[in-house]
Regions:
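Hydrophobic transmembrane alpha-helices and their immediate loop junctions
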Residues: 1-159
Length: 159
């Protein structure tokens, strides 16, 4: 429902994606060139996915289903994707909102700094978790992937 929310909102805004490309770590949507979304609309589209996850988790909580695995999955996915780290949805929304308020290069630099400022502690925490558990490397690997993406500005697993 996460990716579907992005696509549905793009259709509702009259700008369906020209191409939806599945990658190893999610989905990349190539924008439609016939209708360009405003920065505010881009931010809304970016938040549609994590917002849907958080709404699903909230609904499950209200129904007393917080022990169900989908509750935790939706909650974590929604919270993680809301972080203002590019290329996460929150980072894309943050970047769009910055570009609406300041010149492109300044917005790009600020978004990069905020993303890096959040990724570095995540990587440190991931390393601590790996040392303590001796097997859980998930946060460390995700942080390293995000750092490489941020520096290279491309999806490393997009095939």
């Amino acid at each position: 429902c996460h990716e579907g929310a992005h696509i549905l909102l793009m259709f509702l805004l009259g700008a369906p994606p020209a191409l939806v490309k599945l990658t190893a770590l999610g989905c990349r949507m190539v924008p439609n060139r016939e209708k360009i979304l405003s920065y505010g609309q881009m931010a809304l589209v970016s938040f549609a996915g994590p917002g849907t996850n958080l709404l699903c988790a909230g609904g499950m909580f209200l129904l007393g289903l917080e022990a169900h695995p989908f509750f935790g999955a939706n909650l974590v996915l929604g919270m993680l994707h809301s972080l203002p780290i590019e290329p996460m949805d929150g980072g894309m929304a943050f970047h769009a909102l910055l570009r609406a308020r300041m010149k492109g290069e300044r917005a790009d630099k600020l978004c990069f700094a905020v993303s890096l400022g959040l990724i570095l502690p995540m990587a440190g925490l991931g390393f601590v978790i790996l040392l303590r558990t001796r097997y859980n490397f998930t946060l460390l690997v995700m942080s390293l992937y995000l750092m490489l993406y941020l520096v290279l500005k491309r999806d490393l697993f997009s095939g």
